[in-house]
From Swiss-Prot:
The keyword Secreted applies. Belongs to the FARP (FMRFamide related peptide) family. Disulfide bonds: none annotated. Increases the rate and amplitude of spontaneous contractions of semi-isolated hearts. Increases the amplitude of excitatory postsynaptic potentials in abdominal extensor muscle. It is found in: Secreted. Keywords: Amidation, Neuropeptide, Secreted. Its main location: secreted. The lineage of its organism: Eukaryota, Metazoa, Ecdysozoa, Arthropoda, Crustacea. This is Cardio-excitatory FMRFamide homolog NF1.
Length: 7
């Protein structure tokens, strides 16, 4: 995902 550890 876009909000998971900068990804």
């Amino acid at each position: 995902n876009r909000n998971f550890l900068r990804f």
